[in-house]
Regions:
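N-terminal Rossmann-like NAD(P)+-binding domain of SDR-like oxidoreductases, especially those catalyzing
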Residues: 1-123
Length: 123
């Protein structure tokens, strides 16, 4: 198996303040875990995991990690969390990714995937 990332590349994230939206999803959980293991200071912002048990709830995180369970469409809460945390880096992974759900609830999908991103960019 080919090594995709050298350890020295991950040293960049040591003690960086990182804000991750969608940290309870599949990709967000792994990103949070990887950065946490590399001593980043992380605040995650996401809805509760949709599956039980979830990958997110099965992973173990350090005391450097804080999880906020909230909706990316709540502009004031999102703004307050980002402003108070003062991140060096923001990873935006929050989304409504389920295609069938997008057909059944297109407004929610639009709000989350478009307006949620717009909320983040407005801050």
């Amino acid at each position: 198996m080919e090594i995709m990332v050298e350890k020295n590349d991950l040293d960049f994230f040591v003690n960086k303040r990182i804000f991750i939206t969608g940290h309870t999803g599949f990709k967000g959980s792994w990103l949070t875990y990887l950065l946490d293991r590399n001593k980043a200071i992380i605040k995650g912002y996401s809805l509760s995991p949709i599956s039980k048990p979830s990958l997110f709830s099965n992973l173990k995180f350090s005391d450097q990690f804080t999880s906020v369970i909230s909706d990316i469409n709540d502009f004031e809460k999102l703004r307050n969390e980002i402003v108070n945390f003062k991140p060096d880096i923001i990873f935006h992974l929050a989304a409504q990714p389920i295609v069938l759900e997008s057909y059944e609830n297109p407004k929610n999908t639009f709000d989350t995937n478009f307006r949620g991103t717009l909320n983040l960019l407005e801050i």
